[in-house]
């Protein structure tokens, strides 16, 4: 009689993921270990008055390893929408070239949403991957208003890197913070957010 090999103990991270999946099954939904990172650039802060002018997407695993880099899209908007930008947006989006990219783009908001969803469906199941980013609640507000199908594709839970930053500065003030450079272009901002969360994982979540 051959005895089965002893089962290896699960790591804390694997055990936590198993618990999350079991909870998901018991409630009729699943939580994937794949994370959806989205960053938007907008003409302002109000989703009822302003529009999206750039979107970028990355999928990582739960250890923040990049699995795939999605489309980085400047979205065409008419001049009447660009004219709604305040001085801050005009200054920064002129300097980083985004306004020119928007004017030259032939991609509509609807097409940008479709392309992003096509990318995500290759790597994620609908409703199973958390939406991640810096101040991601603001991005979700714009997605809900302007790209609702994409917003619904993401799990309703989020990982907000800005919240981790604020808590770490208050609870662990002696730990070195993370200086995230930002040119206010969507893809660069996403990559910076991933690096920032990786920094807190190594320095805070030990």
Give the location of each predicted region.
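Intrinsically disordered, low-complexity terminal extensions
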Residues: 15-27, 125, 198, 202-205
């Amino acid at each position: 009689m051959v005895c089965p090999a002893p089962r290896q103990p699960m790591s804390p991270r694997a055990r936590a993921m198993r618990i999350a999946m079991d909870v998901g099954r018991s409630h009729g939904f699943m939580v994937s270990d794949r994370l959806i990172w989205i960053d938007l650039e907008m003409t302002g802060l109000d989703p009822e008055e302003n529009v999206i002018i750039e979107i970028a997407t990355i999928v990582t695993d739960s250890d923040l390893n990049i699995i795939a880099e999605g489309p980085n899209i400047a979205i065409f908007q008419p001049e009447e929408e660009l004219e709604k930008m305040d001085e801050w947006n005009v200054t920064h989006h002129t300097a980083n070239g985004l306004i020119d990219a928007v004017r030259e783009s032939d991609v509509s908001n609807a097409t940008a949403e479709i392309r992003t969803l096509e990318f995500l469906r290759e790597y994620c199941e609908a409703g199973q991957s958390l939406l991640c980013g810096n101040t991601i609640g603001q991005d979700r507000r714009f997605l809900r208003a302007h790209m609702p199908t994409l917003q619904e594709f993401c799990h309703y839970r989020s990982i907000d890197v800005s919240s981790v930053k604020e808590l770490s500065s208050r609870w662990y003030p002696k730990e070195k913070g993370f200086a995230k450079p930002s040119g206010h272009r969507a893809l660069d901002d996403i990559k910076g957010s991933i690096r920032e969360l990786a920094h807190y994982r190594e320095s805070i979540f030990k």
